Every structure is written in structure tokens, then in C-alpha cells.
């Protein structure tokens, strides 16, 4: 089968106006970025709120492995399949970050015959949203240091400036820096550092804001420093929010593209799920629900991270409730969770599959704990055997009382996921019940962290370092105790040890730091060795990305 990029280039794309027409979006509501990408105007989006929303379908997955699960591919394939069986469906995805594109992961627009296109533009600069978010964040950083330089009327303590800088690249050398060296004219020297753009609170605010007014209000709430007498300083205090909103105005309009089968997809916002809340924008999701009968969206990494945050943060803030949840699994990944080395995954191994099934079982059980109907989508790989698929379906049926459906959308497009689509429609017929959240907002911040760790991760308890515990107490004293928790931890395990696969129990979840994201409306708990600025691997994907003799990109996929 051709590579993903070859398949994408061979596709005949519809003019974006034709894709919009399927949804009833008029030409004057589109801001075109070439022939195949458009932003949907703020005014048109606002006018959709009076419409009755359709059904929301969440796609999540088992704990990811290097063997790959294909969550985005399944999201796209399911959206195409729902359209094929006559259900008007919108797909809502996150925008890819440049860092992972050039690092370990490569592109992030689906794969095989279940892709969103134009793939190269989506994976690289797209419509410039990440540039706008990086610029707005950088403007705030410049205004903070400028305020300190010119008299410091707010009495900001330069030892307690919490606002780090960002860049949309994996660059470990920037994690800790010293700035303002070179003399008096350059300001006051202090320690600083960079995070990747997708970890910026501006990105989180961007993705949780309902509209421009809400965006500006949330930006104003962001706590960026403390004074010498330990009072909190916000972006509103340094008069940053108006100019930042101007930089983000056009970016906040969701991006409309299409699948290989010509179906609509909104791709907007892109916070990571291991160091942020991992969901596309509220604006895009709400627009999708009002433009289509079904909206299929994904949450990053495994259900312990992306889905939990989708339900406990995004749904809580935006008033959303999924009608059905698809948990993506592969035979290969489950065998890896069962102890098989990656180089041996092509061989049939029923025993390892059954052992690794514990990972899928915990994710499904956790999601049912939220009160949600679940179906398992088994992403088919050519080396899988019929016996392995039969065993997985048997395990799901007998141990979980859940249906597992083999999907071949990577090879066949939407036609390969029609059985999954019909199962989703069946699950979605009942009126969704209120979500049973992992914790109550009135609980103490420490108790919320403990609830996530013990209920969802299988931990015996949590261990919060002294400095982090003191910060949590301060957050509660300052009136932020009601906020939900955003866990920042490895995506590869239920624990904080990325090598502990399967479904570990009795471990301790260590919290080494916490950060207040008052604008986004959550508290980040940083666990284990997770970094908010990733590094590149020994052999980054960038090593093989180039332009060929015809000026086309080679190696992105």
C-alpha cells in the first residue's frame, strides 16, 4: 500500500466551499486559505448557538505504545463511516504541533485511507494559529519584563515570575535559561525557561474559551507573578489582554478542511494531553454539534489522560456530554502491554494478548465509571491473526460485557468502519445521562489528585512533595480550591513510570510540582519526570524530511 503522503497527494480534493455547502455554511462565512482550507467567521459561529446540538462521540484509546494505536485514524475513519451510512457527521480534531512532527511522532492527520487533507499544510504551518498563540504568549512575556524594567509599579518580585516563554519546537536546551544578561540596558537578570507552545496556558485558554469576550476575560485571569508581599499578579494587571486578544482574533475562528472522502473536519487548537488538557477547541466542538447530527472528536493519548480531562475539565466547563465513547485498541499494542518486544509483535501470541488485555479492561471500566456507553474499536493490522481478533472479542464480551469491533479504515477508508459506525449509532440512541465525574469540585485539591490516582490509575496513594503541597495550600487560600485538576504525567503507563505497562496496581503517584492555570480554570499537577518542554529523540523525524527535486515534501509521513 502507498505511504500516507502518497495517498494524500493522489486524492482529488473538493473546493472547500463545496465541503462547507454540505453543512449549509454560506460562502460569505468562510475566510479561505487557498482552495482547500477555510476559517469559519466568528459571526456565523455565534449564530449557530440557537440550533439544537447533535450527538457527541468521543474517541479515546488504551495507553499508547511505540506499536501505535491509530486513534486519529479511527476518528477520521469513523466520521467517514457515519457519513457513508447516512448520518451527517463532523469530525473535530486538534492541530498538530511542529515539535512532534520533527521529533518522534511525525505528522498527525490520520493515516492510510482515513486522513484529513491537505495533510502537509495541516501538519506544518496550517493557518498560523500556533504562530498567533506563540506570539500572544511572547507578547505577555515581553510586557511583564518591560513593566519590571520601567519602575515596576506593581512591585513584582522577579524571583516569583511564573510566566515562562514558549516555542513550538522540541528543544531541551531551553528548559532552563538565564535572561537579561549583558548590562543594565537589558533589564534585570533572572532565571527563566521555555515550554512548548502546546503547554502554554494561552493554548489552554484558547481551547476552552466560548468566544472572543470569554477569551479576553480568561486571559485577564492568568496569574503570571507574585509581588514582594506575595499578592498575585495577573495579565490584566500588566494590561496585556487587549493586545493578546487582537493577536488571537483570527486564530480563534475554527479551521474547516476535509477527509479523503470529502467529509468535513474542523481542526482547531492543540494542547497536549500529557502536559495539558489534550482536547480541541470548545468553539469547534460546539460548532460541529450544531452543524451536524454527529460530531466525532478525540482526546489525546490514553483514556487515563485525554478522556479524563475531556470529561472532568472540558465537558464540565462547556456543558457537553458524550452520547458514546469509542476506545481504540490494537492487537499489537495489547501484546506489547503483555510483555512482547516490539520486534516480535508480528508473531501470534494469545497469552500475551490476554495479559495485555488488562490495560484495555481498566480503560473501559474507568469510562463506564463516568456513566458512559462504550464500544471497543480494534484497529486492524496486516500481521494480526483471526485467532487473536476472536480472542479479544471473547475477552471483551465475557469480562467486560462490551462489544469489540474489528475496523479496517486504514486500508479501506470509511467502508472499513461501517460496523463500528452502526454500533455507535445504536449506543447513541438513549439520551445521555449526566457524567459521573471522578471528583467533586468542592473537594480539596489534594483529594482531587488522590481520586484520579486511586480511582483511575490503580494507585495505592499519592505522594506530594513539600513544595508542591505548600503551593496547593496557597492556591486554596487564594480562592482556587474549586478548580479541577489537570494531571501532567507520562502517557505510556497508568503509573508515573513509563516502563510499567499493562494495568499496574498499588503504586504511588508522586507529584513533584503544581501550577495554577487560573485563566484556563484548572490546577496542573506535574507527576514523575514529565517535562513541559520535550526534547528530540536520538534520531528525530527531521533527519529524513526534505524537499525532493520537484519541490515536494518527502519524509513527513
Swiss-Prot record:
Looking up Gene3D superfamilies in the UniProt record yields: Domain 2, N(10)-formyltetrahydrofolate synthetase (3.30.1510.10), Formyltetrahydrofolate synthetase, domain 3 (3.10.410.10), P-loop containing nucleotide triphosphate hydrolases (3.40.50.300)
Chemical reaction(s) catalysed = (6S)-5,6,7,8-tetrahydrofolate + formate + ATP = (6R)-10-formyltetrahydrofolate + ADP + phosphate
Pathway per its UniProt entry is:
One-carbon metabolism; tetrahydrofolate interconversion
Q: One GO molecular-function annotation for this sequence?
A: formate-tetrahydrofolate ligase activity
Q: What is this protein called?
A: Formate--tetrahydrofolate ligase
Q: Which family does it belong to?
A: Belongs to the formate--tetrahydrofolate ligase family.
Disulfide connectivity?
none
Q: Which CDD domains match?
A: FTHFS
Tell me which residues bind ATP: 65-72
Show the stretches that span the lipid bilayer.
none
GO BP: tetrahydrofolate interconversion
Record keywords, A-Z: ATP-binding, Ligase, Nucleotide-binding, One-carbon metabolism
EC assignment: the record states: 6.3.4.3
